[in-house]
């Protein structure tokens, strides 16, 4: 009975907060801005973003308002990712999460204590609308891994762009479990949807982002973690009273490099990373590109690989042009030759023994032999003359 009362009281507080936000939460929000302006004024939220265009980094920054991005998971990484894209002026955001804000989340970024009890997508939407009312938001408070919700999730990423009926430009995975990652992977492979995956380790000191283009790069099932490859139920790995570590610093770094990769991909500047890792212990950022697995367990991935091969074969082949190096001073009118100061016999004598190596392997250099009983040449002659006599001779020179 006590639990039921506590649940009802929490629900009442949640409804009161929603009512308060609906009444006055947006009163101080600025008016919508129809077009981005490079004008440098205190009231222009886009002036510093438009400076990227003036400095030659981005050709057409205003294009960002035409893009739609779906974010699955609005937790430590996803909420900060949504905030960054909102501040950058993205056209539309689709947010998917079924969890609620808890006080245990306060060690992370974005959410505030007074939002405890609200669903993450609702709390995020209220905050993000106040940050930038120019962005359109569509939120879904459900678990995408259930059958019905999965079908709806696929429908929204296929038809939920700014222009209804068009697919989103990018899907971002910011979830914290393999089941949800595999659900996103399955949907994107079936639809041919480009997406980016992100994650933070359980010890909170490393993370990664990965760009996945179906058929062109490895999907999440091509090289799955052990927990997926061995068909282990990850729920059995969690114990009562035990949770993963969480640092706002690591999550902020991962969210930052994820959004940076998103901006480079959408606005076509810089080099887009297929995989970028982060090791906080050594400040190490490894990068790599992973090719798809021809024996991938996902049949849609294998199908996308075949489609990509056909597409590549249809592209006209570009012939590589090899330029011959020009010979400088080909004519040697003066008969100049390069002569070594060391003869071959002297070189062999100075070289160390050549080790016994297999056929085809040679050494770049050998260790010189150590000559024994070497004495330095005498450069100082002994004399019975005094120091004063020697100084007098020096003055007379």
Swiss-Prot record:
Positions binding Zn(2+) in this chain are 219, 222, 296, 301
MF-aspect GO terms: ATP binding; protein homodimerization activity; UFM1 activating enzyme activity; zinc ion binding
Name a GO CC annotation attached to this entry.
cytosol
- Keyword vocabulary terms for this entry: ATP-binding, Cytoplasm, Endoplasmic reticulum, Golgi apparatus, Membrane, Metal-binding, Nucleotide-binding, Nucleus, Ubl conjugation pathway, Zinc
- Please give the residue ranges the record annotates as the region Linker: 340-370
Do you know which Gene3D superfamilies this protein is assigned to? NAD(P)-binding Rossmann-like Domain (3.40.50.720)
- The source's domain of life comes to Eukaryota
InterPro entries named among the record's database cross-references:
D-isomer_DH_CS1, ThiF/MoeB/HesA, ThiF_NAD_FAD-bd, Ubiquitin-activating_enz
Task: Say which family it is in.
Answer: Belongs to the ubiquitin-activating E1 family. UBA5 subfamily.
Q: What is known of its domains?
A: The UFC1-binding sequence (UFC) motif mediates interaction with UFC1. The linker region is required to activate the active site of UFC1: it region moves next to active site of UFC1 to reduce the amount of water molecules in the vicinity of UFC1's active site and thereby elevate the nucleophilic activity of UFC1 active site.
PANTHER family, from UniProt? Answer: UBIQUITIN-ACTIVATING ENZYME E1 (PTHR10953), UBIQUITIN-LIKE MODIFIER-ACTIVATING ENZYME 5 (PTHR10953:SF9)
Q: What does this protein do?
A: E1-like enzyme which specifically catalyzes the first step in ufmylation. Activates UFM1 by first adenylating its C-terminal glycine residue with ATP, and thereafter linking this residue to the side chain of a cysteine residue in E1, yielding a UFM1-E1 thioester and free AMP. Activates UFM1 via a trans-binding mechanism, in which UFM1 interacts with distinct sites in both subunits of the UBA5 homodimer. Trans-binding also promotes stabilization of the UBA5 homodimer, and enhances ATP-binding. Transfer of UFM1 from UBA5 to the E2-like enzyme UFC1 also takes place using a trans mechanism.
The subunit structure is:
Homodimer; homodimerization is required for UFM1 activation. Interacts (via UIS motif) with UFM1; binds UFM1 via a trans-binding mechanism in which UFM1 interacts with distinct sites in both subunits of the UBA5 homodimer. Interacts (via C-terminus) with UFC1.
Name of the protein in question: Ubiquitin-like modifier-activating enzyme 5
Its lineage opens with:
Eukaryota, Metazoa, Chordata, Craniata, Vertebrata
